[in-house]
């Protein structure tokens, strides 16, 4: 067993190897504060046959024992990964994937199991560092190591791995990963932070990453295994030459077709023709012929952009595709927006619910629920394909979370807008950057629904083609540029600053110059898109949809909650039955009343106010007789509150029998004459009758005399 440690932000990171999971290719027990994550990395001995990609799998396993919880439900064990676990797995996958040899086809599986959680020390960051350590110590050919940190900013001061208390005050949540030389991955949510400040935060994080990488290099020198020799996929040089000679300029001409579907059809036609022509000369090598064609396609696109400064669809480097904006296209939904950018189209729908509709979270974090959520769907027809539809995959969950994070800073607080908000983005057409189109569509549907968002938000995806020291930054990348390029850098924000960032790259890092130019170009594009959106809808609708619930909030004394609910829910169920509203009661006394009919909601408010009102001595009430005894009648003066009219207080004259004056169900006006020490209410009908007795004929009442003067 060997143990290595270093300090990060005043807390000790300890990497232990050689004690746990020794049969894995590489394994470490990573501890940061009281957060402990077991990370293993294992590679298959032989390449997987018949594939043209690198089969890397990253699993992030949350164990609820890490926070002292027993899983809910009947089975009482962890089930499918939570959304947070999927996002954490993606966070680990993205910076390590570009760092394996080209042509490496062996299966590699990284498993990060969270075993103990200290809320001040993020387990996903520990898992990321642990994954790099496990791969670097193993015999798997990994070209790392990498480091990862969380950057926050409180009162203008940048912080590494902020504590939970600091994170609550921070105006950014920025995850940075990279090698000692360059940034590999960025994932951020921010509260309208200027682009220049985001660059500073990224580079600040990278300085700490360089320390973490140096620490791992020292560790590998002591405890690392020799890297195994693995066969890398090689193409027959004769086959490659034959393909290139046969294709000539055919592929270049096909690539320069500006329409996606026509271009794809033209490219497929060239590929089919080439395969049919060369397969007799190179039997059983169809896959390799297609691989060479794919390589040529990538080379042509990259040369067009970097040398000829021409994009496949003819746009300039910073030109954005034609934009179309529509709102309110679905009649019965609470809000809807259709955002179209070129051949990318997203329909976003906003649904408003009550506080009872919020999402309950059962994970390792301290957050137990959320009232704003965004879900993203990517059906196969959006790209003209067929495939089974079996629920959201990792990509869809990641895109939904990114769009959710982009809008979070502008969502009104619960006090300002007491609704649960669900957004759903349907990517109905895709040619690149549907996640950023989802951000734009979200703004449209929120404003169409009448949600008082603080500012509109738009998003844009930037691309990069880098050849040596030369690079080109592309605005609003389409599918081909994303697939064949080196970077997908998504930026969302308002006119005043960035609210979300996500950067994935396929090369071994990007520097400050590239990041700066990409963010500056993204801002220009974002403002252009915002102008197009605001020309159609420039502020939230004044009136909500008639099909959306109207929510009225009120507060009562928490001690009176039981009076509103009643025994076995009798009182509250009666209110719901009478008014048709939906009622949610919080422990602090806040009551949310929801109804599509405002008058019904107001009626429920009046009933609750009467239930929680205190009966006052000397005040006159009108109520119904509920019970008759031989000594008097009980009258309900307020809902759930009864008082007694003693037989002697029923009338001015002597009453022999209670039923001679009142019967059950009669409405009577009474005055509260006493509330005794036991809380019993004594009423008088006699006092009311006396007060209402006509004045003596011929005389003037004092109040009338006053009015005469």
Curated annotation (Swiss-Prot):
Protein's organism: Heliobacterium modesticaldum (strain ATCC 51547 / Ice1)
Family, per entry: Belongs to the polyribonucleotide nucleotidyltransferase family.
Catalytic activity: RNA(n+1) + phosphate = RNA(n) + a ribonucleoside 5'-diphosphate
Pfam families linked to this entry: KH_1, PNPase, RNase_PH, RNase_PH_C, S1
Required cofactor names: Mg(2+)
Location of the S1 motif domain: 618-686
Protein name listed in UniProt: Polyribonucleotide nucleotidyltransferase
SMART domains on file: KH, S1
Residue stretches making up the KH domain: 549-608
Binding site for Mg(2+): 482, 488
Xref: NCBIfam families: polynuc_phos, PRK11824.1
GO CC annotations, alphabetized: cytosol
Lineage per the UniProt record: Bacteria, Bacillati, Bacillota, Clostridia, Eubacteriales
GO MF terms, alphabetically ordered: 3'-5'-RNA exonuclease activity; magnesium ion binding; polyribonucleotide nucleotidyltransferase activity; RNA binding
Swiss-Prot/TrEMBL keywords: Cytoplasm, Magnesium, Metal-binding, Nucleotidyltransferase, RNA-binding, Transferase
Localisation per UniProt entry: Cytoplasm
EC number: 2.7.7.8
GO biological process: mRNA catabolic process; RNA processing
Primary localisation category: cytoplasm
Function comment: Involved in mRNA degradation. Catalyzes the phosphorolysis of single-stranded polyribonucleotides processively in the 3'- to 5'-direction.
